[in-house]
Amino acid sequence: MSSPENIHPTFGQLLGREAKEALLKQRGLVVWLYGLSGSGKSTLANALERRLHGEGVFTQLLDGDNIRTGLNSNLGFSDDDRQENIRRIAEVAKLFADAGVVTIASFICPRNELRAMARGIVGQADFLEVYVECSFETCERRDVKGLYAKAKAGEVKQFTGRDSAFEPPEPREAADLILNTDEQGEGESLEQLYRAVNPRVALPQA
């Protein structure tokens, strides 16, 4: 466990963010997508990354499944572990954004307090909160990963939306963008997402 006595920050000696953004010719940003399993957030995150990459934007995708097999492999799904999961992800996302990288995070992130914590860690100016809204019934019908069937059979515990609550943004204005994948297709959702992200990653003209 770290303590103030054995930590010696060297932030003043580090290469500044502006220099890194100038090299990449872009602004760092964290695009934080969240929603139920099966809502389409990972599909949109991947599609957004490919589109930005095709335009020469340097990106990094942080996805729930990948993070939990590496960085957060020691965490479960208790309330405390869910909070630590999001805290670590937000800290990593902040590091990427500070390096000028457009960081796309895709996680269930089920509670308002967790999203507020992530926004606080990253910083308001660098955080774009995107709620991928989709009804439980539609997500259960899609069941892309077979998790809803396993949860129904009791094979998956603490499953969000069934055993563990998912909180929509409250107030709804807490989310910077809401994409309703019940009502619109992937193409329309991606276009809305891209239009929200693109202006925020462009460097101001000198």
Residue spans of the language-model regions?
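Extreme N-terminal, non-catalytic leader segments
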Residues: 1-30
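The conserved Walker
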Residues: 37
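Conserved lysine of the Walker
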Residues: 41
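Conserved substrate/cofactor phosphate-moiety recognition/catalytic segment
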Residues: 46-94, 98
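Conserved beta-strand scaffold positions in the cores of enzyme catalytic domains, especially
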Residues: 61, 127-131, 176-178
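ATP-dependent NMP and nucleoside kinases share a basic, alpha-helical "lid"
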Residues: 70, 74-77, 93-152, 158
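Small-molecule kinase domains that catalyze NTP-dependent phosphoryl transfer to phosphate-bearing small molecules
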Residues: 133, 141-192, 200-206
